[in-house]
Curated annotation (Swiss-Prot):
Location in the cell: Cytoplasm
Transmembrane segments: none
Function: Catalyzes a salvage reaction resulting in the formation of AMP, that is energically less costly than de novo synthesis.
Domain of life: Bacteria
Organism (species): Oenococcus oeni (strain ATCC BAA-331 / PSU-1)
Protein name from the UniProt record: Adenine phosphoribosyltransferase
InterPro entries per the UniProt record, alphabetical: Ade_phspho_trans, PRibTrfase_dom, PRTase-like, UPRTase/APRTase
């Protein structure tokens, strides 16, 4: 039986700042059947794209990408916030819906030519994902697709992704 994943997204107005409608995935990832369904839907989308590795930005991209990588029998590469990696890394800056940030990956985390599927919990403006795409490209990887639990359609993140690179795209829920 399919679960309506909308039932497992909590909405908090004016968080983290006024005017932002925060979509909280904690109820979804806290419910085994709903979490399993969401991960399986993204796996079903990613599998035909034949990724060699899954990548996801800190922190909630880890929650989406790690179980996908495990189920597909491939690795997971974290895109970490600035200053969290101890070895040589590449960096990419981006703007968030409510601020600015920088992501990094170790230089040996993706090998040239690897097929990379990028995931996150939520797509807003597209800054986090396009920064992750930039990191993958800096390391010689090929982005084969992107997937999200939630897409905030009004913020046009999908458009931003497609302007950077026209890749297969999947969001499970749209607000």
């Amino acid at each position: 039986m399919d679960i309506d994943l909308h039932d497992y997204i909590a909405t908090t107005p004016d968080f983290p700042e006024k005017g932002v409608m925060f979509r909280d995935i904690n109820p979804l990832i806290g419910n085994g059947p709903a979490y399993r369904q969401a991960i399986n839907e993204l796996i079903d989308f990613a599998r035909p794209l034949k990724p060699d590795i899954i990548a996801g930005p800190e922190a909630r991209g880890f929650v989406v990408g790690s179980p996908m990588a495990y189920a597909l029998g491939i690795g997971f590469v974290p895109a970490r916030k600035y200053g969290k990696l101890p070895r040589k890394s590449v960096s990419s800056s981006y703007s968030l819906e409510y601020g600015k940030n920088e992501l990094q990956m170790h230089v040996d985390s993706i090998k040239p030519g690897q097929r990379v599927f990028i995931v996150d919990d939520l797509l807003a403006t597209g800054g986090t994902i396009t920064a992750t795409m930039d990191l993958v490209r800096q390391l010689g990887g090929q982005v084969v697709g992107t997937g999200f639990f939630i897409e905030l359609a009004d913020l046009q993140g999908r458009k931003k992704i497609m302007e950077v690179e026209n890749v297969p795209f999947k969001s499970l829920l749209e607000y």
